[in-house]
Amino acid sequence: MKKVTAMLFSMAVGLNAVSMAAKAKASEEQETDVLLIGGGIMSATLGTYLRELEPEWSMTMVERLEGVAQESSNGWNNAGTGHSALMELNYTPQNADGSISIEKAVAINEAFQISRQFWAHQVERGVLRTPRSFINTVPHMSFVWGEDNVNFLRARYAALQQSSLFRGMRYSEDHAQIKEWAPLVMEGRDPQQKVAATRTEIGTDVNYGEITRQLISSLQKKSNFSLQLSSEVRALKRNDDNTWTVTVADLKNGTAQNIRAKFVFIGAGGAALKLLQESGIPEAKDYAGFPVGGQFLVSENPDVVNHHLAKVYGKASVGAPPMSVPHIDTRVLDGKRVVLFGPFATFSTKFLKNGSLWDLMSSTTTSNVMPMMHVGLDNFDLVKYLVSQVMLSEEDRFEALKEYYPQAKKEDWRLWQAGQRVQIIKRDADKGGVLRLGTEVVSDQQGTIAALLGASPGASTAAPIMLNLLEKVFGDRVSSPQWQATLKAIVPSYGRKLNGDVAATERELQYTSEVLGLKYDRPQAADSTPKPQLKPQPVQKEVADIAL
């Protein structure tokens, strides 16, 4: 019966798309140089780059909802962290000999510096306005308890001091000092408990929805940019001249139109995979997706909010995905401070918060079903974790909160359902399929269409991700003197690494902090800490990571 239902659904969708395409042929075809599918931060960032690089190019953006930045980019649907590995312990895994690997942390931090430079440049151009409306200084902290975890944090701190990007980090195992940094975390805690924390003053809270709205608002001021809301892509067809005809349905009046584009970017968040499959390019066959949602506990009580000014990340428990680590965060949303704790994983077959329950089934094909099965079989610990999260009660979530806020009161908190994150599953020659953390740009060989898949670190690295897309799709233009000069004006550090260059790191942090109105003090000498005891780690099966 299920197979019959699925088949009938697929036939209905297919017939609807054919009908839409036929109706659209009767209407006049719109032409555009660039079609941006999705009104989120990725499309907004790419459009902003292209507006400066090729101001004469025409652009059209289509968004299925009634406004932009209403899905994953919406401030309430994500953690709002400027991910720079200052506190996220999953970016510094422990090696078998007990040492700490910082390569991933350095790469994440370098990427966020590009985002800071991109935003600062847009403020100077008047594209982004009032930096405090979208980015604010919120110290980033790591906090752990227990001898093994404290030793890990010591080793992490010592390792990160070798990088110019982490020089301003502080370290302490003193209860009084940590209480000064984060009162909520320490008040009511056992004074004999062994704890440790790091704190970096230049951490940020970012409202990606506000950035998206401001970028798109600026794009709309140009006559060769068009924004179409309540518009859903129903079909994509490659033409003989390598342009694309995209059928777009108006969800309000039921009509359809064809848009002929020289280049198509699919920046539709969780919906990107299905649209990539619809394009028919062979590269799409390597991918599948698995949706995971997230919930947060939220407090707007002034007694809580005014007592906490930090993002405090812990360490994932044994058997849990590293990215699942709980954190208690100061957020600035809708112009006011709130505190969020989470995330707690949820499950839905939707690929978007405003998606369809058929999303997972309709994206499963004969070419990706086996990789999905391999991932499920190879990651049983992850499956157990997700099941345990879905089964959490209100009391379970509150007990998790009390580990980070011992004196928390139930009446101060409410549960909030955040957005959906579609994890990448990619075909693998050895394992059949692997779960990939991070984002991936998928494009055709001709460079006429590209999609962004994945979820983490996501919005905080939109600027470097879209730079990567430009290099992949417009390689010849990127290497031209004109584009090189423009890109280096947008991102002063473009083409070189900040890590290892203290003067360059401080120069860029000082520049972006001044323009964005962020706190920045020149780093002082590193804190003296006990020497970490590097203990060989027991061999354990690695738990696949997911983004929440």
From Swiss-Prot:
It comes from the Bacteria. Residues 530-541 have a biased composition (Low complexity). Keywords: FAD, Flavoprotein, Oxidoreductase, Tricarboxylic acid cycle. Residues 520-548 are annotated as: Disordered. InterPro entries: FAD/NAD-bd_sf, MQO. Pfam families: Mqo (PF06039). Belongs to the MQO family. This is Probable malate:quinone oxidoreductase. It comes from Shigella dysenteriae serotype 1 (strain Sd197).
